Amino acid sequence: MHDFQFRAKGDKRLKAFSLQDLKKSHTVNIKWRFQKNNDNGQVITYVIDNINKQHCVVEACKRIYKRAISLKIPQDRPIAVFTQEKMGRNKTSYINDIHIKNLLQEAAKNEYNIHCKKELSAFTSHSIRVGACVLLHTQNISPEDIKFRLRWRSDTFRTYLRNNLQLAEKHRDAIANA
């Protein structure tokens, strides 16, 4: 639970483990314990999105935090957990890359009607970071900011950039306005 630090407006620290204070959260600082780039312990700040709460990192962190408290997860343990029923009993498990891969592949089947195993194999836990990279690129975020915010040490993120509908529309509009 120490990997999330919630703050109110004005960067005021909130009391740790207070569900009442959690409602005042304006930002969350997330400590990334282990990273592929070995920049372990890096802290990144996320700001609440009051317009699009469904995709708000702060709101997601609040749900994760509340779930960890309700499941009595020890404070020194990872809090990305879920419960599932196995043999008539609820079992708490840590969310791992296999769970994420399975959820993303199921979403790809349901949302995009993808059923080819080879195509589905492209949907992995890394897809979230790649998708964020592509989305930021389509929104004209600078390569330096993409690299910094998504924790890339090299320029390999550029290999993930794709042609997509948003870029095709910008290309069309640029030609139309030329």
Which residues fall in each region the model found?
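Extended, non-catalytic subsegments within catalytic or DNA/protein-binding/adaptor domains
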Residues: 1-178
